[in-house]
Amino acid sequence: QHYLNGYPSKAYQLFEKALKDYEIANEIISLMQIQIPKNSSFFRTQKNHTPNVRKYEDFTTNMHNPLDLFHPKFQHRRFVPSNRFSISGYPSLYISENLQTSYSESFPNDESGSFHVVCFKNIRPLYFIDLSQKKLFRNKFLFEGVLPKKGKSSSFDVAGFLDNFGAYQLILASHIKMQYKKSDEREKLNFKAEYIIPQLLLQWIKQQNLAVDGIRYYSCTAANKYPGIKNYYNYTLPVRQSLQKGYCPSLCSLFSSCEVYSYFNNRLTASQLKKIELELNNSKFKFLA
């Protein structure tokens, strides 16, 4: 409420106090960290906004440099919108664990279209605050409803849930997806209330100087669009340095990348996306920095 009343600093102070008073901060630091091994694959897609380009081909390469699909350039801050974990004007790198998840972020619901895609691989292990949280306890009830579906034999670990109740509240708050009614299809949403708490969380992580690279969380769109896939994880990595132009050297030093592929088939199936993912994984990779 402080945030909506125009007091973002008060909102952060209250958020920080709640994490401390309810011992959620300790849960985040001790239970909610995950290591991703080096040479893991991450994907980032971007809608193709160039009309009538290479219609006679299904795909091409070299239309873009890999950095074109990295975080927004510092000199383009004015174009950076508010995202789930990052405030307007603050560049962050958003990547996905598989191509289907990344594609669904560019084309939510039943949308589809031509796009550019790149695969990044991390040069060293990466460390994240894990908001997907299969680790806290094994039941998947958090994203499937509290009661097990009919026919399931899995039991509900009430004790495990209560032990980490504060952490689960934070996880739920970070995954809310609200439906907004647009007066016009061309209307652009510049503010989403469900982003307030995730953005406060990222601010808190930066303020604590935790030895993590970012946050891992479930993709709300991929879970709906491709229910058959398992690991629909997204990752956000905030920039470590704020420069006048270019890209964050610290983030660039973490990754190698393949060349950018551009696809013009507007109706790709999940299996076709999986095939593209394998092709990207087997491509040649070069260091970003």
Predicted regions, residues:
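Active-site and NAD+-binding cores of ADP-ribose-processing enzymes
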Residues: Q1-R78, N109-D110, F115-A289
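Short glycine-enriched loop/turn motifs at secondary-structure junctions
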Residues: R84-Y90
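Glycine-rich, histidine-containing beta strand-loop boundary motifs that form or position
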Residues: S96-E97, V117
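Short active-site loop/helix that positions an aromatic residue
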Residues: L99-E111
